[in-house]
Amino acid sequence: MNMATFLRGFEEKGLKNDRPGDQFSKEKKKILFSFCEVCNIQLNSAAQAQVHYDGKSHRKRVKQLSDGQPPPPVQGSVPLLAGPCPCPGPGPNTSTGSACHTTTLPALVRTPTLMMQPSLDIKPFMSFPVDSSSAVGLFPNFNTMDPVQKAVINHTFGVSIPPKKKQVISCNVCQLRFNSDSQAEAHYKGSKHAKKVKALEATKNKPKMVPSKDSAKANPSCSIRPGTGDSSDKSEDKGKIKATSSSQPSGSEGGSFLLKSGTTPLPLGAIASPSKSTNGAPGSVAESEEEKAKKLLYCSLCKVAVNSLSQLEAHNTGSKHKTMVEARNGAGPIKSYPRPGSRLKVQNGSKGSGLQNKMFHCEICDVHVNSEIQLKQHISSRRHKDRVAGKPLKPKYSPYNKLQRSPSILAAKLAFQKDLMKPLAPTFLSSPLAAAAVSSALSLPPRPSASLFQAAAIPPALLRPGHGPIRATPASILFAPY
């Protein structure tokens, strides 16, 4: 008897009275072989059910049930009913029968248990929301935990930590952004940042020292009209200037630019520089340069930037700075002379260090240089330093011999060279042996002793060949058998 026929007969017997339609019978049939309660396995077809019921695992579980031992529980299984095994099996006539030899069971006993099984469409795990506040409440020390523990709890319970905003550290002076406090600290302590801050401070202080054109336009007291107008305009301007001078305090910055009554109008260039209008002495200019150098920590004469006032003082007391100051003033051994054709440039251009477009002469070393850069290089050279310190000159290395040569030796050498350069007679080269002898004699180096050259030079008659034919040397003979 086949398993499929058995299931069909079981369905006809069990569902004879309650068959509302074909669709309901198909569902019941599907439920019968869709699930095995003993092994808790879902079966999808009759052939799959036949193979499962004939297997060893199913027989073993059925044997355990028949002996009264409950099989090991399976997760998600439904408790078994008391009684014989609910799985169908072949009849007694079959050759390979199942261990469960029960015949048919009533449909009322078996159907409700099968109807209680979950269908294939139901998900085994259902997601349920977990409140984040409850998870934090479970862990009272959640805020003080390690970041690894927090990450594990967040992944498990879904606790979301609000993302922290990244702190942006930037330098508005240098237009830079930093990733950490250590980077920002290193930048603020650096020389580049300090130089830019000093340059900004210098630009802020400049409008206070020198009035700009806009401020001159805004303040009628500082604006001076040229003296080419009518007399009525001049009187009005003088009245305005007197009124403003009486209203402004004497200690204000703008008071130094006001004109006194009865003075002639000055050009705008004289008003723009307060140091010139107050005192034209060179001492005040030098003081202002020192003050600027202290503010900016920069020596405009030597073009050297320093980081502190102590470094600036050490530089000012150094020999290089003093030498440059002496070169500018012309008081030391280095004298400065104006370069030809550069007077117009000096008048039109800015002052600077006062050493532009000049030539310099070092009297100690007797050296002329053409620019300020060359002067600095010469001052820092070893030659100038040794001369200033009074050290003797070091001899320069030369590959040539510096022995003093006597005039007699030089005269003898010149006479011998002249004799060798004279044209020889044609009989001199009459034979190859004589030519070889002459060439070998000419190639000999002259002896250094002066005793050979005290007499007259060797006459050319001594170099002539002797009387009679001279036999030439025979050529070598090679023996070749083939």
From Swiss-Prot:
Pfam families: zf-met
SUPFAM superfamilies named in the record: beta-beta-alpha zinc fingers (SSF57667)
Zinc finger (Matrin-type): 34-64, 169-199, 294-328, 360-390
Any one Gene Ontology molecular-function term assigned to this protein's record: nucleic acid binding
Biased composition (Basic and acidic residues): 231-240
Keywords assigned: Apoptosis, Metal-binding, Nucleus, Repeat, Zinc, Zinc-finger
Main location: nucleus
GO cellular component: nucleus
Region named Interaction with p53/TP53: 106-482
Region (Disordered): 54-75, 189-259, 268-287, 331-352, 378-397
One example of a Gene Ontology biological process annotation: intrinsic apoptotic signaling pathway by p53 class mediator
SMART domains, per database record: ZnF_C2H2, ZnF_U1
Localization: Nucleus
Region (Required for induction of apoptosis) location: 1-105
Keyword Zinc in annotation: yes
Function of the molecule: May play a role in p53/TP53-mediated apoptosis.
Subunit text: Interacts with p53/TP53; the interaction is direct.
Record's protein name: Zinc finger protein 385B
Organism: Mus musculus (Mouse)
Lineage: Eukaryota, Metazoa, Chordata, Craniata, Vertebrata
